[in-house]
Amino acid sequence: MMKQNPILITGGTGTVGSRIASRLIKLGYRVRIASRKKGALADAEYVYFNWKYASSFTPALEQVKQIYLVAPVGVFDPAPYVLPFLKEAKRLGAKRVVMQSASVVSENGPVFGALHQAVREFPEWTVLRPSYFMQNFINVQHRMSIQTEGRITTASGEGKLGFIDADDIAETAVRALIDDVPHQTHHILTGPEALSYAEAAEIIGAAAGRRVEHVSISRSELQHKMEAGGLPADYAHFMAKLDEAISHGAEHRVTDTVKRVTGKEPRSLSEFAAAHAAYWTSFWTE
């Protein structure tokens, strides 16, 4: 029997949100996914939601006590969209908000800073700050260049990151949403080891049975590349600066948060690569 009040997931058809939704449903929770399109999860309730239209906020938030919040993607300043949403959530009685942020973005910094503060005004809150997703290697960010060129291109130099599987983020998010005692903290989430992109490329190449290399470019080159790919200039500038920060050690850390919160060891990149090798060989021949 499903619990009475729905748990709202914004970005519920995305990489992490879809994983959270499926886990909550298996645990017997009622899940409402706020999205512009209907997904494939049969037992979820879908409601039309668009950050640009505040009129879509109230129907999504009715009867909701717990929210998983993913800010609009690719927007340098999401506060004008998200703060009115949180205000409406509070008015309608939402009690707990779990927000997805990023470990490389400072708590009071650009993009998420104002949202971090707003989330903390709820009676129960958690901010998840994961390192870079392992899924970036199998989606639009890096998959095609690995397939066609055997390359991963960044401005991160030799900087290391605690790459994390989205499944481990989702497991942590579920605990933050449903644990009896609210977490009331920022969770820095990483995988079990810190790796450079060159080391990641070597692991991926070994799994795929081919040579994969990391190509390091300048921050400005990366920004131009991102703009050419369709990112707004301000957001491309911000993202390229994050890569530069990584090159100086901003992401060189490993935490035990996933294990502490979920009781499970996070997945390694070697394990992830072995399970996803087919993603990097589809268009490649010797």
From Swiss-Prot:
Assigned EC number: 1.-.-.-
InterPro entries, per the entry: Ergot_Alk_Oxidoreductase, NAD(P)-bd_dom_sf, NmrA-like
Leading EC class: oxidoreductase
SUPFAM superfamilies: NAD(P)-binding Rossmann-fold domains
Source organism per UniProt: Bacillus subtilis (strain 168)
One Pfam short name: NmrA
Keyword Oxidoreductase belongs to the record: yes
Domain of life: Bacteria
The protein, known as: Uncharacterized oxidoreductase YesF
Family recorded in the similarity comment: Belongs to the NmrA-type oxidoreductase family.
GO molecular function: oxidoreductase activity
Gene: yesF
